[in-house]
Amino acid sequence: MGIKSLFGFGQARDKPVDKAADAGYSFLFGRTTSGKPVNERTAMQTTAVYACVRILAEAVASLPLHVYEYQDDGGKKLVHDHPLYYLLHDEPNPEMTSFVFRETLMSHLLIWGNAYAQIIRDGAGRVLGLYPLLPDKMDVQRDDRGNIYYVYSRNSDENPMFKEYGDIRMKAEDVLHIPGLGFDGLIGYSPIAMAKNAVGMTLACEEYGASFFANGANPGGVLEHPGVLKDPSKVRESWNSVYRGVNNAHKIAVLEEGMKYQQIGIPPEEAQFLETRKFQINEIARLYRIPPHMVGDLDKSSFSNIEQQSLEFVKYTLDPWVIRWEQSLQRSLLLPGEKGKYFIKLNVDGLLRGDYQSRMNGYAVGRQNGWFSANDIREMENMNPIPDEQGGNLYLINGAMTKLEDAGAFAKTDTGQQNTPAQENSGKRGKR
């Protein structure tokens, strides 16, 4: 098999195949150089992968998700009465909340590289519900006319009470598909598959450590006998049954027939086990672009740089995923006549908020310079608005400010000079 056939370069573009379901993609999974098999489920058994997936999935699921309407003046209006608002913000289907739905799909994205959901529509094409679909059971194809369609394999593991199994063909408009990074723009590649050796080494390190401590943190040793043993394996098994394992650690050994026990020391390279594990944790964090302090590595973190790292997490890690979600939701859920009128937005502003004093200073600058009203500030602080008659929507500026070209105009009069307000007040006091 050549490298082109492995990556599918030789295939025609009008026949895209879901690489996660294609046999030609299996080289990305399976055995690794560490000897450990890696797939989506074994990868989640490592704490680093589980932590990274959980951080990103919960971050996307917790963001406010709203439907907005474009306004003629260039602004936007939150539309609570749009049918999609309740589905996306509260309950996409009777079985799960919006948080659980988004958390599930985001987990699929981070593990398989693709997220799918079935779209239930009424006769007019309006969305009635969204149901997650497992990516490893989905195949993406094109028909002879070049139209994309989806084939979902349903079996008893998914729903034991359902009696009809087999492949279900769905139209593109009936599937919400959010792809991750991919080479053809249609199918995303699994991050776990692309980094299978790093994940495999992490699994191997964890297994090695577990085995080491299962033996009582004893690296092993040699039993020396002055004579010739007829059955060495029997002596070894007898020794291990009595002295091997955590429960048998620190027992006093009794040697017979002149036998001696010589312990084997831990080689220096094996003594670096903790450093190896720490490196592998950072390797997985690098895969998902997660700051080390968010997965528990605080070696190079301080009070001053953790806030900056958290802001960079929102900007460079979370924002690209948010854009993928927003554009996929708009493309799949909005009707053709709605796409120029409405848009769907995940709001990350709450994650970019600074400490209380910094926010108040920023609000003060915006308020004094006219780009914030009192209600603008109260909305960002999740407070109720002030009525219009009390000036809640007024935009104010400092009255002492003037244009540069008018800087000296107040001193001029028709005859030459004009008293300043301070001079006028001084003159009035003198006349009294």
Predicted segments — roles?
Residues 306-307:
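Small-residue-rich helix-loop
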Residues 1-286, 290-293, 297, 303, ...:
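Structured, contiguous alpha/beta core segments that scaffold functional sites
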Residues 315, 319, 330:
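Conserved nucleotide- and phosphate/pyrophosphate-binding catalytic cores
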Residues 292-303, 327-340:
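Short acidic alpha-helical/loop segments enriched in Asp/Glu that coordinate divalent cations
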Residues 353-378, 402:
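Periodic self-assembly scaffolds
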Residues 327, 331-334, 365-368, 428-432:
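Viral virion structural and adsorption modules
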Residues 272-276, 280, 310, 355, ...:
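Secondary-structure capping and boundary motifs in well-ordered enzyme cores
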Residues 332-354:
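Generic long, charged, amphipathic alpha-helical segments
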